[in-house]
From Swiss-Prot:
It is found in: Membrane. Coiled coil: none annotated. The chain crosses the membrane at residues 18-38, 53-73, 81-101, 166-186. It comes from the Eukaryota. It is a multi-pass membrane protein. InterPro entries: TMEM205 (IPR042623), TMEM205-like (IPR025423). This is Transmembrane protein 205. It comes from Mus musculus. Keywords: Membrane, Transmembrane, Transmembrane helix. GO terms for cellular component: membrane. Belongs to the TMEM205 family.
């Protein structure tokens, strides 16, 4: 497209719907549903639910970032891009990269380690309780202190889970900043 040419109302609406839908989904999964489920479900049931939700969630995030990049990238000749347009493309590329890392690499590894942890926990009669309902010493801490294999698996799980959380927060922040930029560019409400 030539500099300054309007991409059309439909493209603008699709871009806004995909971007805001992705961001809303990310806010829900990151800050609301996970905490509600964690406090309401037995530990292993929570893990099972998350292992089913996260692959879909990460792939939808990846798809939304890809769609938005495909919409935005061809809108202007690259030489005519403003600083904001370059920033927005960079943020969407970052979101696509982080969502891809989560969807294609981290999620499968995190789930595999979680299943190995749950197998050991089941052998010890753990995993059917809702977190935070312990009376007395924490049985998971005791298991971690007594079983080096379990302790190593927990470290590995938290490593993958931490990286996945950072990638997810990066996607959320990238999409949020893109939405802020779009909102600041509105002429009226």
């Amino acid at each position: 497209m030539e500099k300054g040419e309007d991409p059309g109302s439909l493209i603008k609406v699709i871009h806004l719907l995909v971007l805001s839908g992705a961001w809303g989904m990310q806010v829900w999964v990151t800050f609301i549903s996970g905490f509600l489920l964690f406090r309401s479900l037995p530990r292993h049931t929570f893990g099972l639910v998350q292992s089913k939700v996260f692959p879909v969630y990460f792939h939808v995030s990846l798809g939304c970032a890809f769609i938005n990049l495909c919409i935005l990238a061809p809108q202007r000749a690259w030489i005519h891009l403003t600083l904001w347009e370059v920033s927005q493309l960079s943020l969407l590329l970052l979101s696509l990269t982080l969502a891809t890392i989560n969807a294609r690499w981290l999620e499968a590894r995190t789930t595999a380690v979680m299943r190995a942890l749950q197998s050991i926990e089941k052998e010890r009669g753990l995993g059917t309780e809702v977190p935070g309902n312990f009376q007395g010493p924490d049985p998971y801490r005791q298991l971690r202190d007594k079983d080096p294999k379990y302790s190593a698996l927990r470290r590995k799980f938290y490593h993958y889970h931490g990286l996945s959380s950072l990638c997810n927060l990066g996607c959320l922040l990238s999409n949020g900043l893109c939405l802020v930029g779009l909102a600041l560019g509105l002429r009226s409400l």
